[in-house]
């Protein structure tokens, strides 16, 4: 249901620090759309739409 920072760092082959920035950015977009977000996690469907569409 959610990807964690560690999973995103592994998939994108980036540092954990960069993965946190990506997650924060995606969660900021979700908040603007009215969704409740969880720090350090991003919904799998939303992540896949943004990175693998």
How does the language model describe each region?
Residues 11-48, 52:
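Major-groove DNA-recognition helix of helix-turn-helix-type DNA-binding domains
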Residues 2-3, 41:
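A generic alpha-helix surface/boundary motif
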Residues 1-2, 53:
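Absolute protein N-terminus
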Residues 5-6, 45:
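Residues within the helices of the helix-turn-helix
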Residues 3-4, 25:
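Short Gly/charged-rich anion-binding patches and loops
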Residues 1, 9-10:
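Amphipathic, hydrophobic secondary-structure cores in small proteins
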């Amino acid at each position: 249901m959610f990807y964690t920072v560690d999973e995103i760092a592994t998939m994108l082959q980036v540092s954990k620090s960069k993965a946190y920035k990506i997650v924060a950015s995606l969660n900021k977009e979700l908040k603007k759309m009215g969704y409740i977000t969880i720090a350090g996690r991003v919904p799998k469907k939303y992540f896949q739409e943004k990175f693998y569409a």
